[in-house]
């Protein structure tokens, strides 16, 4: 039975008010019919290519390169188009130009002896690549992607045949005129950016843009201007959202992590957070303290620091860590329902003897200098610490760039996403030992599974946006911190975060953080099916896509789990994890032919990519191959278009039976 035969006079009358509104956009039978034809045509195009990335952790150079080369897709297309008609070095040069047009043009112009001839050859090559990557889209969609100043010319070049002699001459005249009017550079840049844009139709970031890397703010700048993307918040993203909401414990954690890895760029250069008060306080308070255990991990730092600066960062690191423990204890005292009393650890120190007393056992402390801690009241901030935190608070709350990036995270982000039979979330859905969903108490009500993630999503938004209910906002702000380190938080899901123990106790038995049952049970297909069903994801080819836990490829661990139902794609974008993973990240690519996992080798640098044509070496694995090419009609977008077509067909009937008059 067709959609047309489902349309009855009763259904049209029931939808009449909506159809009258729709008639404003399509005021005639001809207009509605044309739109139906257009939408039906779109349904039968191949689905756009989706790219999934996770756990970028501030590694902006590698992230931007993967976007520019579309995880190796641009290089593959250049090889397909030009085959043996170009030498390998020429194909490499063309790819580098597509990735970094402005920078590569400068190098070319400094060395090329006949620049006009180079322009002529290169523009023809770019037109061929552009024709290839745009072939799966409607002309309308391509047109919307074009820069306004070159829109008409690019359309002419893309849609004219070069086989007919007359058309070939026509195209050559256009290209020659671009060169003679000295617009070749701008045109090449526009074409390269268009190729990048059309090669990735949609981008999914499955959490953790932020953390230890040097340029989370640069990644956010890129995303805020990106044509089509979404974000599933990771634990580090939530921590920054908590800081931007005004939670001072989250602010302290953010600063501590930056100090630990010697990456101050995001805080200072990106968001203008004034760290001078912290530096002054740390120098005064820890002037005679070597702070040895707080020395930053400089092999991951964003700059090379001299000895004096390293000493200062070390002191600042210790100062903010102690403040963090105090601020967190205040939340724990305020919220006994969080059940985290066992994480108040300063009170377990015997300050006179320099030992940590835990469960009847004594452990020597690696650092025994606590000038700001009163043993009688260990969690009270000193007057100087209180003043410092107020200044840090002011700095976070008045950063315009941070506000812009947080709005972007809220607008395009969420705790999870269901898209084209895939369920995306960063870390976990808390489970009991038997695989049932763990019930989590929030404000006296129990939540689990999908409802739990929905409730948490709402609380995070309340923490940032709510101006009306002060008590609700205060709870939500505290709960954001719980999401960072609370045992029942889907974004954390461990028994504890052993920050204190890792700093102060040498005995590694106290460093252990036990993961929730999800991480053991997620390898079972029936568990993944249960989670997918909970989120309403049904069908033959359904998947859960996760990040959060690095896949130790170097030890033989596989990203595919539970018979292919679960894909864990944290492969180590973060340089800190690359020794563990043995690679430098994954991209999951979902196109009309199926699912592919692209495994990346470490990226050297943008400079080497531009000057030497160094690309990321990537290995592609086919996870799922579609025997029949997947079309737009098979996607979520296709379902929306089918609904729109049905509404337009109702409008046509309403016009034809006179319920709505045409506006000719």
Swiss-Prot record:
Its cofactor is Mn(2+). Pfam families: FBPase_2. Transmembrane segments: none annotated. Its EC number is 3.1.3.11. It catalyses: beta-D-fructose 1,6-bisphosphate + H2O = beta-D-fructose 6-phosphate + phosphate. The keyword Transcription regulation does not apply. Pathway: Carbohydrate biosynthesis; gluconeogenesis. GO terms for biological process: gluconeogenesis. One of its GO terms (molecular function) is fructose 1,6-bisphosphate 1-phosphatase activity. InterPro entries: FBPtase_class3, Metallo-depent_PP-like. Keywords: Carbohydrate metabolism, Hydrolase, Manganese. Belongs to the FBPase class 3 family. This is Fructose-1,6-bisphosphatase class 3. It comes from Bacteroides fragilis (strain ATCC 25285 / DSM 2151 / CCUG 4856 / JCM 11019 / LMG 10263 / NCTC 9343 / Onslow / VPI 2553 / EN-2).
